[in-house]
Protein backbone atom coordinates (compact mmCIF):
# COMPACT_ATOMS: atom_id res chain seq x y z
CA UNK A 1 0.00 0.00 0.00
CA UNK A 2 2.79 2.38 0.89
CA UNK A 3 4.59 1.46 -2.30
CA UNK A 4 1.52 2.41 -4.35
CA UNK A 5 1.25 5.78 -2.63
CA UNK A 6 4.93 6.50 -3.23
CA UNK A 7 4.65 5.51 -6.88
CA UNK A 8 1.63 7.73 -7.40
CA UNK A 9 3.44 10.65 -5.77
CA UNK A 10 6.46 10.20 -8.01
CA UNK A 11 4.27 10.18 -11.12
CA UNK A 12 2.50 13.36 -10.03
CA UNK A 13 5.77 15.13 -9.34
CA UNK A 14 7.15 14.09 -12.73
CA UNK A 15 4.09 15.40 -14.61
CA UNK A 16 4.18 18.68 -12.68
CA UNK A 17 7.87 19.11 -13.41
CA UNK A 18 7.31 18.54 -17.12
CA UNK A 19 4.52 21.12 -17.19
CA UNK A 20 6.70 23.58 -15.34
CA UNK A 21 9.53 23.02 -17.80
CA UNK A 22 7.22 23.68 -20.78
CA UNK A 23 5.85 26.82 -19.18
CA UNK A 24 9.33 28.02 -18.34
CA UNK A 25 10.48 27.43 -21.91
CA UNK A 26 7.59 29.48 -23.24
CA UNK A 27 8.30 32.24 -20.76
CA UNK A 28 11.95 32.21 -21.63
CA UNK A 29 11.08 32.53 -25.27
CA UNK A 30 9.09 35.68 -24.67
CA UNK A 31 11.77 37.08 -22.44
CA UNK A 32 14.61 36.21 -24.79
CA UNK A 33 12.90 37.93 -27.71
CA UNK A 34 12.44 41.10 -25.68
CA UNK A 35 8.74 41.46 -26.32
CA UNK A 36 5.72 40.55 -24.24
CA UNK A 37 2.02 40.66 -25.06
CA UNK A 38 -1.06 38.99 -23.73
CA UNK A 39 -3.52 36.93 -25.78
CA UNK A 40 -6.47 39.22 -26.32
CA UNK A 41 -8.39 37.55 -29.14
CA UNK A 42 -8.05 35.23 -32.06
CA UNK A 43 -5.94 37.68 -34.06
CA UNK A 44 -3.25 37.63 -31.41
CA UNK A 45 -3.40 33.85 -31.35
CA UNK A 46 -2.90 33.76 -35.10
CA UNK A 47 0.06 36.10 -34.75
CA UNK A 48 1.63 33.71 -32.26
CA UNK A 49 1.05 30.84 -34.68
CA UNK A 50 2.90 32.82 -37.33
CA UNK A 51 5.78 33.23 -34.92
CA UNK A 52 5.84 29.53 -34.17
CA UNK A 53 5.86 28.69 -37.90
CA UNK A 54 9.14 30.53 -38.27
CA UNK A 55 10.85 27.83 -36.20
CA UNK A 56 12.69 27.55 -32.94
CA UNK A 57 15.27 30.15 -32.15
CA UNK A 58 18.16 30.52 -29.78
CA UNK A 59 18.77 33.07 -27.06
CA UNK A 60 20.48 35.44 -29.45
CA UNK A 61 18.21 38.39 -29.98
CA UNK A 62 19.88 39.23 -33.27
CA UNK A 63 18.80 36.01 -34.97
CA UNK A 64 18.27 37.28 -38.50
CA UNK A 65 16.65 34.12 -39.88
CA UNK A 66 13.81 34.26 -37.39
CA UNK A 67 13.33 38.00 -37.76
CA UNK A 68 13.45 37.82 -41.54
CA UNK A 69 10.81 35.11 -41.44
CA UNK A 70 8.50 37.34 -39.40
CA UNK A 71 9.19 40.37 -41.59
CA UNK A 72 8.16 38.44 -44.73
CA UNK A 73 4.87 37.32 -43.17
CA UNK A 74 2.30 39.96 -43.96
CA UNK A 75 -0.34 37.96 -42.09
CA UNK A 76 1.65 38.32 -38.91
CA UNK A 77 1.49 42.11 -38.98
CA UNK A 78 -2.09 42.17 -40.22
CA UNK A 79 -3.13 40.06 -37.23
CA UNK A 80 -1.31 42.42 -34.86
CA UNK A 81 -3.03 45.45 -36.42
CA UNK A 82 -6.44 43.78 -36.06
CA UNK A 83 -5.80 42.83 -32.47
CA UNK A 84 -7.33 44.65 -29.50
CA UNK A 85 -4.10 44.41 -27.57
CA UNK A 86 -3.40 48.12 -28.05
CA UNK A 87 -6.64 49.21 -26.37
CA UNK A 88 -6.19 46.87 -23.41
CA UNK A 89 -2.99 48.50 -22.23
CA UNK A 90 -0.91 45.69 -23.67
CA UNK A 91 2.53 46.85 -24.63
CA UNK A 92 4.40 45.32 -27.49
CA UNK A 93 8.08 45.75 -26.75
CA UNK A 94 10.52 44.97 -29.49
CA UNK A 95 14.14 45.86 -29.96
CA UNK A 96 14.76 43.25 -32.63
CA UNK A 97 11.82 42.48 -34.96
CA UNK A 98 12.46 44.52 -38.09
CA UNK A 99 14.40 47.03 -35.99
CA UNK A 100 17.36 46.87 -38.34
CA UNK A 101 15.71 49.52 -40.47
CA UNK A 102 14.64 51.72 -37.56
CA UNK A 103 16.97 51.54 -34.60
CA UNK A 104 15.21 52.17 -31.32
CA UNK A 105 12.50 50.79 -29.12
CA UNK A 106 8.90 50.58 -30.30
CA UNK A 107 6.18 51.05 -27.71
CA UNK A 108 2.72 49.73 -28.53
CA UNK A 109 0.20 52.10 -30.00
CA UNK A 110 -2.18 52.61 -32.93
CA UNK A 111 0.54 53.87 -35.22
CA UNK A 112 3.35 51.71 -36.51
CA UNK A 113 6.74 52.71 -37.74
CA UNK A 114 8.32 49.33 -38.39
CA UNK A 115 5.55 47.21 -40.05
CA UNK A 116 6.43 48.01 -43.65
CA UNK A 117 10.14 47.26 -43.45
CA UNK A 118 11.47 45.50 -46.53
CA UNK A 119 12.64 41.96 -45.97
CA UNK A 120 15.40 42.27 -48.55
CA UNK A 121 17.56 44.05 -45.96
CA UNK A 122 18.14 40.65 -44.37
CA UNK A 123 20.43 38.07 -45.88
CA UNK A 124 18.27 35.11 -44.91
CA UNK A 125 15.07 36.74 -46.11
CA UNK A 126 16.49 37.04 -49.62
CA UNK A 127 17.15 33.32 -49.77
CA UNK A 128 13.68 32.66 -48.42
CA UNK A 129 12.05 34.75 -51.13
CA UNK A 130 14.06 32.95 -53.81
CA UNK A 131 12.82 29.65 -52.49
CA UNK A 132 9.30 30.99 -52.72
CA UNK A 133 9.78 31.89 -56.36
CA UNK A 134 11.11 28.42 -57.11
CA UNK A 135 8.16 26.78 -55.46
CA UNK A 136 5.76 28.92 -57.49
CA UNK A 137 7.49 27.96 -60.73
CA UNK A 138 7.33 24.29 -59.77
CA UNK A 139 3.66 24.65 -59.03
CA UNK A 140 3.04 26.24 -62.41
CA UNK A 141 4.68 23.46 -64.39
CA UNK A 142 2.10 20.77 -63.50
CA UNK A 143 -0.68 23.04 -64.74
CA UNK A 144 1.10 23.36 -68.08
CA UNK A 145 1.42 19.59 -68.28
CA UNK A 146 -2.27 19.21 -67.55
CA UNK A 147 -3.14 21.70 -70.28
CA UNK A 148 -0.98 19.84 -72.80
CA UNK A 149 -2.60 16.55 -71.89
CA UNK A 150 -5.99 18.17 -72.42
CA UNK A 151 -4.96 19.25 -75.90
CA UNK A 152 -3.85 15.74 -76.70
CA UNK A 153 -7.20 14.39 -75.63
CA UNK A 154 -8.97 16.85 -77.91
CA UNK A 155 -6.82 15.74 -80.85
CA UNK A 156 -7.79 12.17 -80.08
CA UNK A 157 -11.44 13.13 -80.34
CA UNK A 158 -10.84 14.71 -83.75
CA UNK A 159 -9.16 11.53 -84.98
CA UNK A 160 -12.16 9.53 -83.87
CA UNK A 161 -14.41 11.83 -85.89
CA UNK A 162 -12.23 11.17 -88.93
CA UNK A 163 -12.75 7.46 -88.45
CA UNK A 164 -16.48 8.02 -88.42
CA UNK A 165 -16.29 9.98 -91.66
CA UNK A 166 -14.33 7.17 -93.30
CA UNK A 167 -16.96 4.70 -92.22
CA UNK A 168 -19.55 6.99 -93.76
CA UNK A 169 -17.63 6.80 -97.01
CA UNK A 170 -17.89 3.04 -96.93
CA UNK A 171 -21.61 3.29 -96.46
CA UNK A 172 -21.84 5.54 -99.52
CA UNK A 173 -20.02 2.92 -101.58
CA UNK A 174 -22.53 0.40 -100.35
CA UNK A 175 -25.31 2.54 -101.79
CA UNK A 176 -24.07 1.62 -105.27
CA UNK A 177 -25.33 -1.91 -104.71
CA UNK A 178 -28.85 -1.19 -106.18
CA UNK A 179 -27.25 -0.91 -109.64
CA UNK A 180 -26.05 -4.46 -109.18
CA UNK A 181 -29.57 -5.51 -108.29
CA UNK A 182 -30.91 -3.93 -111.48
CA UNK A 183 -28.43 -5.80 -113.62
CA UNK A 184 -29.26 -9.05 -111.90
CA UNK A 185 -32.97 -8.51 -112.41
CA UNK A 186 -32.43 -7.82 -116.11
CA UNK A 187 -30.45 -11.01 -116.45
CA UNK A 188 -33.29 -12.87 -114.76
CA UNK A 189 -35.76 -11.44 -117.25
CA UNK A 190 -33.54 -12.50 -120.14
CA UNK A 191 -33.23 -15.96 -118.75
CA UNK A 192 -37.00 -16.15 -118.38
CA UNK A 193 -37.39 -15.14 -122.01
CA UNK A 194 -34.95 -17.85 -122.95
CA UNK A 195 -37.08 -20.28 -121.02
CA UNK A 196 -40.08 -19.22 -123.09
CA UNK A 197 -38.13 -19.87 -126.26
CA UNK A 198 -37.04 -23.27 -125.06
CA UNK A 199 -40.61 -24.05 -124.10
CA UNK A 200 -41.69 -23.18 -127.65
CA UNK A 201 -39.14 -25.60 -128.96
CA UNK A 202 -40.56 -28.24 -126.69
CA UNK A 203 -43.97 -27.67 -128.21
CA UNK A 204 -42.56 -28.31 -131.68
CA UNK A 205 -40.88 -31.48 -130.58
CA UNK A 206 -44.07 -32.66 -128.94
CA UNK A 207 -46.06 -32.18 -132.15
CA UNK A 208 -43.46 -33.96 -134.25
CA UNK A 209 -43.13 -36.83 -131.80
CA UNK A 210 -46.87 -37.33 -131.61
CA UNK A 211 -47.09 -37.72 -135.38
CA UNK A 212 -44.77 -40.68 -135.31
CA UNK A 213 -46.33 -42.23 -132.28
CA UNK A 214 -43.23 -41.90 -130.08
CA UNK A 215 -44.22 -41.71 -126.44
CA UNK A 216 -40.81 -41.21 -124.85
CA UNK A 217 -40.85 -37.35 -124.84
CA UNK A 218 -40.47 -36.06 -121.26
CA UNK A 219 -42.89 -33.18 -121.79
CA UNK A 220 -45.95 -34.95 -123.20
CA UNK A 221 -48.13 -37.21 -121.17
CA UNK A 222 -49.57 -39.62 -123.68
CA UNK A 223 -49.09 -40.61 -127.28
CA UNK A 224 -50.54 -43.69 -128.84
CA UNK A 225 -52.53 -41.91 -131.51
CA UNK A 226 -51.13 -44.11 -134.26
CA UNK A 227 -50.60 -47.35 -132.38
CA UNK A 228 -51.08 -50.86 -133.61
CA UNK A 229 -54.78 -50.76 -132.83
CA UNK A 230 -55.23 -47.60 -134.96
CA UNK A 231 -57.29 -45.80 -132.29
CA UNK A 232 -56.54 -42.89 -130.00
CA UNK A 233 -55.48 -43.67 -126.49
CA UNK A 234 -57.86 -42.84 -123.68
CA UNK A 235 -55.36 -40.62 -121.89
CA UNK A 236 -53.62 -39.15 -124.90
CA UNK A 237 -55.83 -36.12 -125.41
CA UNK A 238 -55.35 -34.76 -121.91
CA UNK A 239 -51.86 -33.66 -120.87
CA UNK A 240 -52.68 -34.17 -117.24
CA UNK A 241 -53.72 -37.70 -117.72
CA UNK A 242 -50.33 -39.26 -117.46
CA UNK A 243 -50.42 -41.06 -120.83
CA UNK A 244 -52.51 -43.86 -122.35
CA UNK A 245 -51.61 -47.34 -123.55
CA UNK A 246 -49.60 -47.14 -126.76
CA UNK A 247 -48.56 -50.61 -127.83
CA UNK A 248 -50.55 -53.20 -125.89
CA UNK A 249 -48.34 -53.44 -122.76
CA UNK A 250 -46.19 -50.31 -123.35
CA UNK A 251 -46.71 -47.19 -121.18
CA UNK A 252 -45.35 -43.63 -121.30
CA UNK A 253 -42.00 -43.22 -119.59
CA UNK A 254 -42.39 -39.54 -118.60
CA UNK A 255 -42.87 -38.92 -114.86
CA UNK A 256 -45.89 -36.93 -113.61
CA UNK A 257 -43.60 -34.23 -112.22
CA UNK A 258 -42.30 -33.35 -115.69
CA UNK A 259 -45.86 -33.24 -117.01
CA UNK A 260 -46.99 -30.82 -114.34
CA UNK A 261 -43.97 -28.57 -114.97
CA UNK A 262 -44.71 -28.55 -118.70
CA UNK A 263 -48.33 -27.65 -118.09
CA UNK A 264 -47.34 -24.75 -115.81
CA UNK A 265 -45.02 -23.28 -118.43
CA UNK A 266 -47.28 -24.06 -121.42
CA UNK A 267 -50.98 -23.80 -120.64
CA UNK A 268 -51.95 -24.30 -124.33
CA UNK A 269 -49.82 -27.39 -124.98
CA UNK A 270 -52.69 -29.74 -124.05
CA UNK A 271 -54.79 -28.21 -126.84
CA UNK A 272 -52.12 -27.94 -129.54
CA UNK A 273 -50.57 -31.39 -129.40
CA UNK A 274 -53.76 -33.53 -129.54
CA UNK A 275 -55.19 -31.43 -132.40
CA UNK A 276 -52.13 -31.88 -134.54
CA UNK A 277 -52.07 -35.58 -133.73
CA UNK A 278 -55.71 -36.06 -134.78
CA UNK A 279 -55.12 -34.15 -137.99
CA UNK A 280 -52.08 -36.19 -138.94
CA UNK A 281 -53.75 -39.46 -138.05
CA UNK A 282 -56.72 -38.67 -140.29
CA UNK A 283 -54.39 -37.86 -143.19
CA UNK A 284 -52.53 -41.12 -142.71
CA UNK A 285 -55.78 -43.13 -142.64
CA UNK A 286 -56.94 -41.43 -145.83
CA UNK A 287 -53.67 -42.18 -147.55
CA UNK A 288 -53.90 -45.86 -146.59
CA UNK A 289 -57.43 -46.09 -147.94
CA UNK A 290 -56.36 -44.56 -151.28
CA UNK A 291 -53.51 -47.05 -151.54
CA UNK A 292 -55.85 -49.96 -150.75
CA UNK A 293 -58.36 -48.80 -153.38
CA UNK A 294 -55.55 -48.39 -155.89
CA UNK A 295 -54.41 -51.94 -155.28
CA UNK A 296 -57.90 -53.22 -155.72
Curated annotation (Swiss-Prot):
The alphabetized UniProt keywords are: Cell wall, Glycoprotein, GPI-anchor, Lipoprotein, Membrane, Secreted, Signal, Virulence
Cell cycle is among the record's keywords: no
Q: Which residues are glycosylated?
A: 229, 268
Residues carrying the lipid (GPI-anchor amidated glycine) are 275
Q: Where is this region: Disordered?
A: 146-276
Q: How is it modified after translation?
A: The GPI-anchor is attached to the protein in the endoplasmic reticulum and serves to target the protein to the cell surface. There, the glucosamine-inositol phospholipid moiety is cleaved off and the GPI-modified mannoprotein is covalently attached via its lipidless GPI glycan remnant to the 1,6-beta-glucan of the outer cell wall layer.
Q: How does it sit in the membrane?
A: Lipid-anchor; GPI-anchor
Write down any Gene Ontology CC term. side of membrane
Q: What is its main location?
A: secreted
Residues making up the signal peptide according to the UniProt record: 1-18
Q: Which stretches are tagged as biased composition: Low complexity?
A: 146-212, 247-274
Superkingdom to which the source organism belongs: Eukaryota
The residues of the propeptide are 276-296
In what ranges is there compositional bias, type Gly residues? 220-245
The protein's role, per its UniProt record: Probable GPI-anchored cell wall protein that may be involved in cell wall organization, hyphal growth, as well as in virulence.
* UniProt family annotation: Belongs to the IHD1 family.
Q: What is this protein called?
A: Probable cell wall protein PGA41
Amino acid sequence: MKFTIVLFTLISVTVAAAATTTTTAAANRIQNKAYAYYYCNSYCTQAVNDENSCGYYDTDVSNQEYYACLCTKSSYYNNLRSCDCFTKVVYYYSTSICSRANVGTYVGGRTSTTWGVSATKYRSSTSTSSLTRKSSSIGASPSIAIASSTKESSSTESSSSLEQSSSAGQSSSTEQSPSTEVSSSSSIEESSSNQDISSTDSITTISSDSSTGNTDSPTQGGGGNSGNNGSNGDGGNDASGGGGVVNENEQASSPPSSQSSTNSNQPNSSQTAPGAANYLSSVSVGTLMILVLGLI
